[in-house]
Amino acid sequence: MTNFKWIVAAAGLLSGQVLAAPTATSTHAKRATVSDAAFGYASLNGGTTGGAGGTTTTVSSYAAFTSAVSGDDAKVVYVDGTIKQTADQVKIGSNTSIIGKDANAILEGFGVLVKEKENVIIRNLGVSKVLADNGDAIGVQYSNNVWIDHCDVSSDRDHDKDYYDGLIDITHGSDYVTVSNTFIHDHWKASLVGHSDSNEDEDSGHLTVTYANNYWYNINSRAPSFRFGTGHVYNSYYLDVSDGINTRDGAQLLVESNQFVDSKKALYSTDDGYAVSNDNDFGDSENTAEEGTLTSMPYDYTLLGSANVKAAVVGTAGQTLTF
């Protein structure tokens, strides 16, 4: 049984705090280490440790990055500065931690792909403006134990909805994935779990994904969209997200402690998707999803309470760490 722990932030933190919509960077970056523990689904199945204890490399070019993240030996790869390259996704090996050294660590024009791998951590990394022909900003396929944390993923909405692909797409039966503390913004189709209505044989019983403490801003749809899988979405702030959480094709979601501002469809079903909703502030929108059966998770977690989410998440989610 899940150990539900409600916390109340200090009054001084919450009182009178008004933050601009696109703000995601804290004025005081939090110090982090490569040994920080994953949580949510990524903490199960033996946990997700990435490349902790392995070799350490710092890269600042596309060629160096591509070389450093390949192979399955344990390794920590620090990204220093912005790397610009219009190219297909770079494939990441198992037992890898990709760490942005600070808020300037950005991959622009190309993304990363975790395919048929396990035990991968991506933290404090920016990924932006990856053209649809070059794949998703972050893709996870046929993989287990992946932790995406404190990232900043975006494109723009100046182009049509097919100019870019997904920001974070988790597909092909992947399991034990957590997306946390991430700023997901300025995009048409943000995050997909399960890529096709016809992929039930591969996806059913898999696609176990946690989304926690994320800031979603200026998104048209898929925040996230779940097919077939089992998902937990909690402690997240949604601003100007048209179509929010979509549960479909038999997916079971537990949606808790989120706040929506200026959303048209905050939580809804398509083709027999299901959700259980606890303590969500849907603003002017509502929950129209079919009632689900998922009422607990196989891990401990802390709920902020929907009234406290904005103050806790905005300014903390995104590339707000230093290493």
From Swiss-Prot:
* Stored SUPFAM superfamilies: Pectin lyase-like
What is this protein's name?
Probable pectate lyase A
Kindly indicate where the leader peptide sits in this chain: 1-20
The cofactor note from the UniProt entry for this protein is: Binds 1 Ca(2+) ion per subunit.
**Positions glycosylated per UniProt:** N95
- Can you tell me which residues bind Ca(2+)? D136, D165, D169
Which species is this record about? Aspergillus niger (strain ATCC MYA-4892 / CBS 513.88 / FGSC A1513)
Gene Ontology CC terms? extracellular region
Q: Which reaction does it catalyse?
A: Eliminative cleavage of (1->4)-alpha-D-galacturonan to give oligosaccharides with 4-deoxy-alpha-D-galact-4-enuronosyl groups at their non-reducing ends
Database matches in SMART domains: Amb_all (SM00656)
Q: Where found in the cell? A: Secreted
CC cofactor: Ca(2+)
Its BP terms in the Gene Ontology are:
cell wall organization; pectin catabolic process
User: What does UniProt list as this organism's lineage?
Assistant: Eukaryota, Fungi, Dikarya, Ascomycota, Pezizomycotina
